[in-house]
Amino acid sequence: MKTRSKKTKTENNQEKSKEKNKFDQLPLDLEIEIFRRLPLKSVARFLTLSKSCAATIRSPSFITSFRSPQPCTLIASAPIFNCLHPFKPRVLVDHKLSFFSSSSSSSSSTSFLSRLTCPSSPYPRHMEYYCHYVNGLISVGYGREQIVTNPSTGRFITLPSVRTKRRLVKSFFGYDPASDQYKVLCMTERLYGHQEDPSSQHQVFTLGVKKPWKMLDRTTIPDHRPWTNGVCIDGVVYYIAKTGQGMSQLSLMRYDLRDDNLNVFISLPEEIRTPSLYSDTLLNYEGKLAIAIPVTSYIFDVWVMDQDGEKHEWLKKITFNIEPWQSSFDDIRIKGTTLTGEFIFAPMNNYCDDEFYVFHYKSQQE
């Protein structure tokens, strides 16, 4: 009489461990190639399979492996109030942000990624959502509430509330590739204060470190009031702010993630110091800091900072005219750039409920 052998629970666990070890022994480049061939939803499931899989998916090598000659553009879409003026608060109607990816090589290749429900507030018209994209993640700030999300997988984390009693909180987001760290920089302003009042209560939260918000030394930070969006390049966050006596000057601020140093980097020259500066004016153009200035609604000057020498200079790199688009859209803004040097445009106001438009423009100027 034959008897069927039964595997013990220990033996089953040992076999599963062996299978897992086989995957762990694969070369990193092969693991990355395997994950790259999977749908995004499958990649998201692997985040919870093992620490090894999660480490590979979150590694800079895996993130940068998606950089191709035809990269995708990340699009964040949401219905907002007060969208007719660039300096009015952008307040979400239903507290939802939808993320899409789009390829510049095909107008029909836009695909839905995920949707994020943001926190509500009893004072919705007094606060603005601040969104910043850095190295695969998006930081969304709304008053004291801060969220960091991965739009590709839909996963997100809610940070501890910013340490302040004020309702008006401005935020910036940065990534340091040297230490592989993400940080959120926040500062507060008085809700009904004057435009001459500087920001205060500057504090930093480091992702992945179980520590509270870190308050920066106020005595080391010059008086300033943020005026534009922020751009992170090589572990440094830049943004334009009002500085000087009565906040009458415009300067470029520099926040270094490595040592949490926040200071004035350089003053803006007269040619750039213009009322036409708006919230999305800073760009990362081919790895260099750039400023896009609308001469009119359809003519733009792009200035690029030259940091190669000891003297930092702003060079007028490109001037281009997109007036042929005037018949289709009332007002267009530069919203970003691609890794291949294309400029990304979008209408300031989208009057169609079920469609939105994004344009890629490749300048032929040197």
Curated annotation (Swiss-Prot):
Source organism per UniProt: Arabidopsis thaliana
F-box domain residues: 20-66
Alphabetized SUPFAM superfamilies for the sequence: F-box domain
Composition bias type Basic and acidic residues, residue spans: 8-20
Highest taxon of the lineage: Eukaryota
Residue numbers spanned by region Disordered: 1-20
InterPro entries the record matches: F-box-assoc_dom_typ3, F-box-assoc_interact_dom, F-box-like_dom_sf, F-box_dom
Name used for this protein in its record: Putative F-box protein At1g26515
